[in-house]
Amino acid sequence: AVGLGAVFGFDFPENFRYPYCSASITEFWRRWHISLGAWFRDYLYIPLGGSHVKPVRWIFNIFLVWMATGFWHGAAWNFILWGLMYAVLLLIEKAWLLPYLKKHKIVGHLHVLFFVLIGFVLFDASSVADFWDCIVSMFGGGQIKPVTTESLYYLKSYAGIILTAVIGATPLPVRLYGRLQKKKGLKQTLDIAEILLLVMLLLLCVAFLVDGSFNPFLYFRF
């Protein structure tokens, strides 16, 4: 979206700042969908009093803001529960868990990835019952086996894309590129390589669009 906006002369701020590198849900929501979080903070959370109120009122503010965030995505129970789930997680972190997560970064990363994954399932579920069936199956309690021939086939087929996505979800490529640019004699070579890489990515995206089936925009259903 930032690149597309730049094509038309608009300078959009960064909206996602490596959220999967977060070590807490609190940090995750400072990095994920920054513009949405800022809007709810400025126009709902702060007018309600924010955190400068009594504890009971502050808890109420958190729940109301996150229930509204879920409702913003869609008028269905799974979206409301999705928002309330994050409200509970944020309150638990602010109450006592956050200092522990800051000291144990690996545990914090696993904590984030686990609950974000659960949140995505809840977000995309057609109903609460559908969400529960998916969760049961994910943990081996349903009829779907955790490992099948089909799942191994897809894992093998898309291993390269998955690895690229994992690396791209971290700031490592940007940091490496910045260090290489500082070295003498490499800037011109990197500029040419960047153009070639962007052209290759454009062609790859077009190839996927041509080969893939029609997939309507997610928010059209809300």
PLM regions: where:
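Membrane-embedded transmembrane alpha-helical bundles that form the catalytic cores
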Residues: 1-221
